[in-house]
């Protein structure tokens, strides 16, 4: 049969069958059982070696890491500020005083978050000395009490609605945790209203003080039970104010080694949020 001639269907099937298995040479897909065994053994050894090399490399790298303290911390010299409860819209709290469902989620989140700040939950925590860094050498690291009574009108004790039902909402401001951070001076969180004619801002504890006794922080695994110091911000709109909308800006002040300005990070040591209270 010449090259130009087409093979019949039976001849093509016969050649495929012969390729799949040749009874004369006992070859399967062009290879004998010995050949298949050798090539499978080669790939088994080859990929087994790669897997072992990868496993050893990962193991060697993990030996250089500490499971309790991050190895590289020099890129986070100063903490940022966060607000709580988390707004539905980015950094904007909008609610209606006459509609409890509009702020129900905020109240629920605040109660859940502040549960660990109740005195009953802090029985095993230390009553630390005010105004002094609480440095420890381990291996057991104690945590200081932060009673919710420090938040006064925003503690949820006297007003379970945290002021939302009266149009005087409370927002919690907290510093991000940084392991080993030792603030200098007398750190505090100052909060101001961008429009003083519209609303008045109150902070709790008084003057937004962040006590040094809550520093340094030793990490989640070592510092079991640690409570972040909080500052509560309460906004009160004037009775004659027709505009129930204000922007509040909070900054870390009073400490040389805590920055509150950075062109590349607008949350470094500061945060701004907007509150809109409808009738």
From Swiss-Prot:
<keyword id="KW-0739">Sodium transport</keyword>
<feature type="glycosylation site" description="N-linked (GlcNAc...) asparagine">
    <location>
        <position position="240"/>
    </location>
</feature>
<dbReference type="GO" id="GO:0001671">
    <property type="term" value="F:ATPase activator activity"/>
</dbReference>
<dbReference type="GO" id="GO:0006883">
    <property type="term" value="P:intracellular sodium ion homeostasis"/>
</dbReference>
<keyword id="KW-0406">Ion transport</keyword>
<feature type="disulfide bond">
    <location>
        <begin position="154"/>
        <end position="170"/>
    </location>
</feature>
<feature type="disulfide bond">
    <location>
        <begin position="128"/>
        <end position="144"/>
    </location>
</feature>
<feature type="region of interest" description="immunoglobulin-like">
    <location>
        <begin position="186"/>
        <end position="279"/>
    </location>
</feature>
<dbReference type="GO" id="GO:0036376">
    <property type="term" value="P:sodium ion export across plasma membrane"/>
</dbReference>
<feature type="topological domain" description="Cytoplasmic">
    <location>
        <begin position="1"/>
        <end position="35"/>
    </location>
</feature>
<dbReference type="GO" id="GO:0016324">
    <property type="term" value="C:apical plasma membrane"/>
</dbReference>
<dbReference type="GO" id="GO:0042470">
    <property type="term" value="C:melanosome"/>
</dbReference>
<keyword id="KW-0740">Sodium/potassium transport</keyword>
<comment type="subunit">
    <text>The sodium/potassium-transporting ATPase is composed of a catalytic alpha subunit, an auxiliary non-catalytic beta subunit and an additional regulatory subunit. Interacts with catalytic alpha subunit ATP12A.</text>
</comment>
<keyword id="KW-0735">Signal-anchor</keyword>
<dbReference type="GO" id="GO:1990573">
    <property type="term" value="P:potassium ion import across plasma membrane"/>
</dbReference>
<comment type="similarity">
    <text>Belongs to the X(+)/potassium ATPases subunit beta family.</text>
</comment>
<keyword id="KW-0633">Potassium transport</keyword>
<dbReference type="GO" id="GO:0030007">
    <property type="term" value="P:intracellular potassium ion homeostasis"/>
</dbReference>
<dbReference type="Pfam" id="PF00287">
    <property type="entry name" value="Na_K-ATPase"/>
</dbReference>
<feature type="topological domain" description="Extracellular">
    <location>
        <begin position="57"/>
        <end position="279"/>
    </location>
</feature>
<keyword id="KW-0630">Potassium</keyword>
<keyword id="KW-0472">Membrane</keyword>
<dbReference type="InterPro" id="IPR038702">
    <property type="entry name" value="Na/K_ATPase_sub_beta_sf"/>
</dbReference>
<comment type="function">
    <text>This is the non-catalytic component of the active enzyme, which catalyzes the hydrolysis of ATP coupled with the exchange of Na(+) and K(+) ions across the plasma membrane. The exact function of the beta-3 subunit is not known.</text>
</comment>
<keyword id="KW-1015">Disulfide bond</keyword>
<dbReference type="InterPro" id="IPR000402">
    <property type="entry name" value="Na/K_ATPase_sub_beta"/>
</dbReference>
<keyword id="KW-1003">Cell membrane</keyword>
<feature type="disulfide bond">
    <location>
        <begin position="191"/>
        <end position="250"/>
    </location>
</feature>
<keyword id="KW-0812">Transmembrane</keyword>
<keyword id="KW-0813">Transport</keyword>
<keyword id="KW-0915">Sodium</keyword>
<protein>
    <recommendedName>
        <fullName>Sodium/potassium-transporting ATPase subunit beta-3</fullName>
    </recommendedName>
</protein>
<dbReference type="GO" id="GO:0016323">
    <property type="term" value="C:basolateral plasma membrane"/>
</dbReference>
<keyword id="KW-1133">Transmembrane helix</keyword>
<dbReference type="GO" id="GO:0005890">
    <property type="term" value="C:sodium:potassium-exchanging ATPase complex"/>
</dbReference>
<keyword id="KW-0325">Glycoprotein</keyword>
<feature type="transmembrane region" description="Helical; Signal-anchor for type II membrane protein">
    <location>
        <begin position="36"/>
        <end position="56"/>
    </location>
</feature>
